[in-house]
Amino acid sequence: MIDFDGYRPNVGIVICNSKGQVLWAKRYGQNSWQFPQGGINDNESAEQAMYRELFEEVGLSPKDVKILYISKHWLRYKLPKRLLRYDSKPVCIGQKQRWFLLQLVSDEKNINMQSSKSPEFDGWRWVSFWYPVRQVVSFKKEVYRKAMKEFASVLFDGAKENLLSSKSNESDLKTHHTTKKSTFLTKHSKKHFHKSRG
């Protein structure tokens, strides 16, 4: 479903833990990281799409999370010209997203990137709150900045973060290796990385 302006309705999902860290997912077979996201189908609400994508991409159900906040407005980004598919009609020029901030209320071992037949991700880790804004692919940076700034008012009682001067603490990143049924910790360069295996 693409709107009259050429944007595809989409949901973005930020999952935080009790430490205020957020789940950062590695795209399948790539060295590219992002938050879980996905399109909204016809006759589907944004919340319904969020829960569907949450299960398909992360393996979590509604009972595993609590909705803390939903972005007030649609946030848009345009796709680079190299990613546009001119052979499809209408042409999708970008995404308009409704963002959800979720609290993980169950054990992180329930996270399963292999719950779908065509997984979007093959690994994940916990990172500091602002880390994704600096690390995401360039054409998504502004949307991430806006979403996280809005979410910060919820998590940090309106405390303002300086995105330009703040530096991520790499030693605080968590890395784990995961299988479909189990999670085990491994230490490597003081990081914890969750790697999904089929």
UniProtKB/Swiss-Prot annotation:
Its cofactor is a divalent metal cation. SUPFAM superfamilies: Nudix. Keywords: Hydrolase. InterPro entries: Nudix_hydrolase (IPR020476), NUDIX_hydrolase-like_dom_sf (IPR015797), NUDIX_hydrolase_CS (IPR020084), NUDIX_hydrolase_dom (IPR000086), RppH (IPR022927). GO terms for molecular function: mRNA 5'-diphosphatase activity. One of its GO terms (biological process) is mRNA catabolic process. GO terms for cellular component: cytoplasm. Residues 6-149 form the Nudix hydrolase domain. Disulfide bonds: none annotated. This is RNA pyrophosphohydrolase. It comes from Pasteurella multocida (strain Pm70). The lineage of its organism: Bacteria, Pseudomonadati, Pseudomonadota, Gammaproteobacteria, Pasteurellales.
